[in-house]
Amino acid sequence: MNPIVKQFKYGQHTVTLETGAIARQATAAVMASMDDTTVFVTVVAKKDVKEGQDFFPLTVNYQERTYAAGKIPGGFFKREGRPSEGETLIARLIDRPIRPLFPEGFFNEIQVVATVVSVNPQISPDLVAMIGASAALTLSGVPFNGPIGAARVGFIDNQFVLNPTMAEQKQSRLDLVVAGTDKAVLMVESEADVLTEEQMLASVVFGHQQQQVVIEAIKEFAKEAGKPRWDWVAPQPNTDLINKVKAIAEARLGDAYRITEKQLRYEQIDAIKADVIAQITAEDEEISEGKIVDIFTALESQIVRGRIIAGEPRIDGRTVDTVRALDICTGVLPRTHGSAIFTRGETQALAVATLGTERDAQIIDELTGERQDHFLFHYNFPPYSVGETGMIGSPKRREIGHGRLAKRGVAAVMPSLAEFPYVVRVVSEITESNGSSSMASVCGASLALMDAGVPIKAAVAGIAMGLVKEEEKFVVLSDILGDEDHLGDMDFKVAGTREGVTALQMDIKIEGITPEIMQIALNQAKSARMHILGVMEQAIPAPRADISDYAPRIYTMKIDPKKIKDVIGKGGATIRSLTEETGTSIDIDDDGTVKIAAVDSNAAKNVMGRIEEIVAEVEAGAIYKGKVTRLADFGAFVAIVGNKEGLVHISQIAEERVEKVSDYLQVGQEVNVKVVEIDRQGRIRLTMKDLAPKQETEINQEDPVEEQE
């Protein structure tokens, strides 16, 4: 085995591509490394097309092996299971830029498998997997119009940073991944701390320029190690069939695409499609329905795109930069902590915010270690939202991806844990959908968070842009419909505040999208975002001053860290009894910060008083109220503050001589006692003699407390 190796510098890192030694039965296999993070990527392509296949069956799998980080998986089975949310998102990140580079009509099945086999905690494997997938596809000989490059761009001290390390990323105001060919950008995925449109565009251009070194290196690698390119030829169009479909459907489809209501339009189009299939198959039974449907869909695209390029009104009658009618309601669910319904045309999101305590944080076990997530965002897309029936179950790749995009849009305005000590979960239920439900989720989430009293830094809105480009002519569309997304050349989603952008996602289906076109799209998106924010601010101008009556209120107090063990008790007995008896939730940090969550403020104050008693220092000479816990021949044991036991010797029970302790005291009896001394071993000697007559001399353990809402 003689592996072929290509090594090159990429920013501050060294990238190595190796092939020829492992997985030699795959169509292509590449071991891609960036410093010590290594991802093994394979491509298998079937030479034959399944009979009746009418779509491109590309599958991308990304999997992380725990051995890559020198770990053994947790759980009962001690092996990796179903893909995590992070693995699913990276699989989508690989898929999105490579899918448009396969030619139209190519229906051979292809599977890309990326396996993380070694990980340097400072180098994220996602970029390595993208580069490895690009290299493997380029070597495989399949009709792939790549290679692509991939770059991560950070923004630190007003400077763009190429492929920042994990440590550098913590200081960055931007996390942007851009992928593209030598000619054009194909995909952008980003999260930003409120940057301007100009800064976002500059970061995309910077990343695309820098990744050219990757593209050139893969081309050189393919010259040495690549397989012969397949002699695949695109199927010739059936002009007779195209003309037949046009003759039957063109005029009727033109009329159907003037119906503004989605369901009525779809019913009309489905009826036309069924009629076309029936007429043509009646004449020639050998013609497959799939071919007829492909031509029918192409005709739809031609009609819609032609009208947009010609400057005619869009499908629903709008101009290119008009946002659909908005309708907003907040506080729609009576017992939730915060809720809102955001409706934009025929797209609607019900967003609900829930406040929880630190113990509700999600523990995420990654290759680089465990971390806690205090802001959770979940997006649900049920089939009824598009008037269909279907399976209801665990979230699919699309739902996970849309949820993460919406979360990215809102994350920049969330308060820190120190400012607002709650774990926050937002759920977006898409109840209607006709384009850009992820951006409706951003708007709905912002409204629900404000309704819940979460002190977000600013309202956030999102908008989806589209593009139709024919040769040199192009039109940028604001607030695209589902059909415009499907039939257009670009899906461009922007979320942000009045001050700037918080998230940008872009998927481009064609080459030739210039920075100028992207700048027009960003400017048009900003105008639409300002319009939406204006309507949102009328509905709820600022976060509510108080949280919901049904949300837990968190009260904080400080104790001596040395006393934490006393509050917890043996085996957690003390803290468990406190929570069970008061109905509160108690969290204690290592620095002695105690956070008590309770819906009832009296319960919180009660438990705080009891904690104060537990941690209180017993003072010699002080008088306490205590409870007799047990009797002995030589005296009685009395529990005082914090259940600390002291001994009242038989000689200290009364002024007169005591013959029998039980004649004076009973278990459970409350008595006043005075601390005589605390010896070196911490034992407490008590007396019931020589007590001051007035109750006011007793130690009061109540201190003022701080409430955080």
Swiss-Prot record:
Domain S1 motif, chain residue ranges per copy: 621-689
UniProt keyword Signal, yes or no: no
Protein name, per record: Polyribonucleotide nucleotidyltransferase
GO cellular component: cytosol
Gene3D superfamilies: GHMP Kinase, N-terminal domain (3.30.230.70), K Homology domain, type 1 (3.30.1370.10), Nucleic acid-binding proteins (2.40.50.140)
Function in brief: Involved in mRNA degradation. Catalyzes the phosphorolysis of single-stranded polyribonucleotides processively in the 3'- to 5'-direction.
Entry annotated with the keyword Endoplasmic reticulum: no
GO molecular function, one term: RNA binding
Species classification: Bacteria, Pseudomonadati, Pseudomonadota, Gammaproteobacteria, Pasteurellales
Top EC class, one word: transferase
Oligomer status and interactors: Component of the RNA degradosome, which is a multiprotein complex involved in RNA processing and mRNA degradation.
Disulfide partners: none
Family per record: Belongs to the polyribonucleotide nucleotidyltransferase family.
Binding site for Mg(2+): 485, 491
UniProt domain KH: residue ranges: 552-611
Superkingdom of this protein's organism: Bacteria
NCBIfam families attached to this UniProt entry: polynuc_phos, PRK11824.1
Any GO BP: RNA processing
HAMAP family linked: PNPase (MF_01595)
UniProt-listed PANTHER family: POLYRIBONUCLEOTIDE NUCLEOTIDYLTRANSFERASE, POLYRIBONUCLEOTIDE NUCLEOTIDYLTRANSFERASE 1, MITOCHONDRIAL
Compartments in which it is found: Cytoplasm
Cofactor: Mg(2+)
Keywords annotated in UniProt: Cytoplasm, Magnesium, Metal-binding, Nucleotidyltransferase, RNA-binding, Transferase
Principal cellular location given in the protein's record: cytoplasm
Catalyzed reactions: RNA(n+1) + phosphate = RNA(n) + a ribonucleoside 5'-diphosphate
Assigned EC number: 2.7.7.8
